[in-house]
């Protein structure tokens, strides 16, 4: 019978509570990130003589947080045969809470902890379900009379706190199927000032991750690689040298691939200018300087033209509103009805609205001399949404409907029954979608990938966006990176911001009776209350805008 010795190790992050205010609006603190000074962390150190098996494993786990010199300190805890061949980033399992070390009589130590997420060999992260557990057996062996780890699994295990300290996220950028808008594909890399430019380019040239399969393309001709397996950075200039295969790209694709490179490298603070070479000569891109600024390609940004005013409802009528003025729309058809919520496309030539009883959904396309309308019937329609492809989305009871090019398009979601879908909110790039779904844990916020053809839309690879949050009632995209959502786990309801690049949530404020949020970068944020009034966020304060409800912006 095996005997177990129990050791507890604290490698965890302490959650921060909210900051109460006197008013009904309450500011909050970051949840899931690592505030400065909130962790007492063991500094990575080399193994010492006489360490017990559990001390060796504990030291290895702590040393795994340091990626300096290719995890040099962590490698010293391994048997000599493994030190040079261990590939720590083949898979990274991220745990949280308290880890337990159980020492057995068979020269092994079993480590268990709640599993937060897994980072695969291509640096993409997947969040785990709340009840997931990490169980890892470390086999040990005597080397010169000292215990060392005989690792028989790939990758490493690291606490969430140490992950946040030692790693960071970067977006790779890939064009959608129209080659007009770039979409982010998030990777997790060790914090480094020297090697990440090279690693980002290697990952970019390998193409998008599994989560974007079928939804995005790459502008690089097949076979394009780095001609020099390094991206040097000097005085703010990054030089990317590609092989001659890239010369087969037509002029427009050279623009797109340049945008992919420049936007991907722009996340590195030291890089301000990018030069793209073929061998040692500059790649010729039409109407583009040889030295490309990191702000050059804004025309490919999914947020570049989100400038239209919000629409809101007052006494059943549709109003257009901004900070200065609120005015009724000029449309005889819609002015004759009574409406629950409305939305428009970015060019404001497609208007859609849900009737006040939430049983009918009308989409009017005014791009031609005679407007064309599509009518959909259902129950419990929610607030409609538009996307960058001029598709209009609405979710009802057991129903997800999309109108595109004056036709109703069939929508399916992999792995989720429609009766469990509360709402679907397309992203500004039109490639991703937020989903509010009923799960065994409550109402959760998830994210999926939109794959389109002429006849149908599929939402695939649905995954968790945030680790916690089981009472989500509404969500909106503020920009291609940031999502705002309402959680009514307790009153007053909490309003959170989540960074889709990192998964970090921040509690912004709380407000009694919160029902609907509308927010776009550089535009006012609107909050609908249950009493039928609307608040606008202005210079850090909430200002009442009167009896208006259900504000929306074009997607």
Placement of each model-derived feature along the sequence:
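Positively charged n-region of N-terminal signal peptides that target proteins for export
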Residues: 1-4
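Hydrophobic helical h-region of N-terminal Sec-dependent signal peptides
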Residues: 6-10
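C-terminal motif of bacterial Sec signal peptides marking the signal peptidase cleavage site
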Residues: 12-15
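Bimodal "functional hotspot" detector
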Residues: 17-555
């Amino acid at each position: 019978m095996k005997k177990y010795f129990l050791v507890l190790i604290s490698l965890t992050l302490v959650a921060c509570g909210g900051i109460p205010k006197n008013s009904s609006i309450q500011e909050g603190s970051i949840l899931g990130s690592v505030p400065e000074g909130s962790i007492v962390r063991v500094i990575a150190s080399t193994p010492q003589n006489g360490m017990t098996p559990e001390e060796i494993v504990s030291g290895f786990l702590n040393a795994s947080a340091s990626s300096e010199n290719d995890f040099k300190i962590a490698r010293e805890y391994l048997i000599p045969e493994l030190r040079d061949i261990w590939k720590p980033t083949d898979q990274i399992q991220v745990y949280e809470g308290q880890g337990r070390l159980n020492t057995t009589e068979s020269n092994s130590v079993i480590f268990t902890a709640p599993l937060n997420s897994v980072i695969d060999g291509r640096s993409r992260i997947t969040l785990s379900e709340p009840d997931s557990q990490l169980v890892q057996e470390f086999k040990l062996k005597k080397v010169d009379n000292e215990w060392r780890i005989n690792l028989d699994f790939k990758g490493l295990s690291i606490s969430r706190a140490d992950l946040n300290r030692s790693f960071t996220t970067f977006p790779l950028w890939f064009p959608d199927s129209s080659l007009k808008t770039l979409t982010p594909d998030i990777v997790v890399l060790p914090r480094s000032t020297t090697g990440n430019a090279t690693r980002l380019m290697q990952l970019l040239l390998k193409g998008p991750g599994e989560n974007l399969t079928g939804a995005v393309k790459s502008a690089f001709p097949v076979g394009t690689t780095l001609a020099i397996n390094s991206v040097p950075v000097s005085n703010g200039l990054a030089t990317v040298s590609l092989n001659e295969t890239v010369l087969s790209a037509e002029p427009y694709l050279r623009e797109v691939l340049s945008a992919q490179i420049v936007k991907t490298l722009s996340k590195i603070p030291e890089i301000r200018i990018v030069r793209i070479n073929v061998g040692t000569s500059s790649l010729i891109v039409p109407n583009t300087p040889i030295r490309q600024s990191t702000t050059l390609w804004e025309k490919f940004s999914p947020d570049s033209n989100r400038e239209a005013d919000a629409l809101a409802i007052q006494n059943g009528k549709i109003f257009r509103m901004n900070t200065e003025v609120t005015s009724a729309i000029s449309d005889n058809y819609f002015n004759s009805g009574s409406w629950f919520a409305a939305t428009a496309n970015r060019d404001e030539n497609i208007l859609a609205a849900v009737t006040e009883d939430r049983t009918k959904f009308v989409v009017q396309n005014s791009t031609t001399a005679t407007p064309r309308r599509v009518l959909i019937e259902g129950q419990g329609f929610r607030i409609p949404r538009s996307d960058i492809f001029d598709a209009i989305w609405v979710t009802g009871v057991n129903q997800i409907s999309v109108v595109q090019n004056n036709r109703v398009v069939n929508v399916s979601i992999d792995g989720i029954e429609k009766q469990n879908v509360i709402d679907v909110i397309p992203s500004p790039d039109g490639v991703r979608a937020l989903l509010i779904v009923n799960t065994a844990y409550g109402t959760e916020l998830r994210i999926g990938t939109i794959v389109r053809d002429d006849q149908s839309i599929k939402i695939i690879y649905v995954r968790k966006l945030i680790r916690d949050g089981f009472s989500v009632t509404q969500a909106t995209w503020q920009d291609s990176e940031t999502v705002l959502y309402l959680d009514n786990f307790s009153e007053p309801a909490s309003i959170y911001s989540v960074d889709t690049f990192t998964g970090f949530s921040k509690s912004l404020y709380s407000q009694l009776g919160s029902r609907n949020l509308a927010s776009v970068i550089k535009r006012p944020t609107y909050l609908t209350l249950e009493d039928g009034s609307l608040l606008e966020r202005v210079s850090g304060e909430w200002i009442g805008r009167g009896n208006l409800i259900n504000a929306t912006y074009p997607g």
